[in-house]
């Protein structure tokens, strides 16, 4: 259970890379990856995300049996900004949860894949790990943080992997 999120994330990336009509690409050198993502991730010297001090007033930790590691935190940051998680490579989590707006969206309804609109305003995504709410989304349809992370990818309007209208389904 400890490595479940990492395994799901890797599996999801592998699955998404197989969902293409394009020719197979060759491996990209590490330097090219750094240039594409505009960051300098050094796997041997990761930031210390796992051991952050937490204020005493915070009593809840939504990570449960899936503790945060530096590797998982870096993977999460990369996936959060990765537009290839949408069916048409135009939308990432950060498209709606914009850092400049407190990880929320300045519009009433966010824009999803193929120019479509979502039905709701994107919720703010700050410290969901320590949220005192027991469920996620406006309608509380996600019982766990892991479900909250994967649901938008499978939504027809948000990121498109819904299984509707001939689209692939990740579920």
Task: Specify the residue positions occupied by each region the protein language model found.
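Bacterial N-terminal signal peptides that target proteins for export
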Residues: 1-8
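Bacterial N-terminal signal peptides
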Residues: 8-17
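Periplasmic c-type cytochrome electron-transfer domains
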Residues: 19-171
């Amino acid at each position: 259970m400890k490595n479940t999120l990492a395994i799901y994330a890797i599996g999801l990336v592998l699955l998404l890379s197989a969902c293409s009509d394009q020719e197979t690409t060759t491996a990209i050198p590490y330097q090219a990856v750094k240039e594409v993502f505009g960051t300098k991730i050094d796997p041997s010297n990761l930031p210390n995300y796992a051991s952050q001090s937490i204020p005493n007033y915070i009593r809840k930790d939504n990570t449960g049996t899936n503790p945060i590691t530096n590797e998982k935190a870096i993977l999460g940051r990369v996936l959060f900004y990765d537009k290839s998680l949408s069916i048409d490579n135009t939308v990432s989590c950060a498209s709606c949860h914009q850092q400049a707006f407190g990880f929320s969206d300045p519009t009433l309804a966010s824009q999803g894949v193929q120019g479509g609109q979502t039905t709701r305003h994107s919720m703010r995504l700050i410290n969901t790990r320590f949220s005192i709410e027991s469920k996620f989304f406006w309608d509380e349809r996600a019982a766990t943080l892991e479900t909250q992370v994967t649901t938008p990818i499978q939504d027809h309007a948000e990121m498109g992997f819904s299984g509707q209208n001939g689209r692939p389904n990740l579920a």
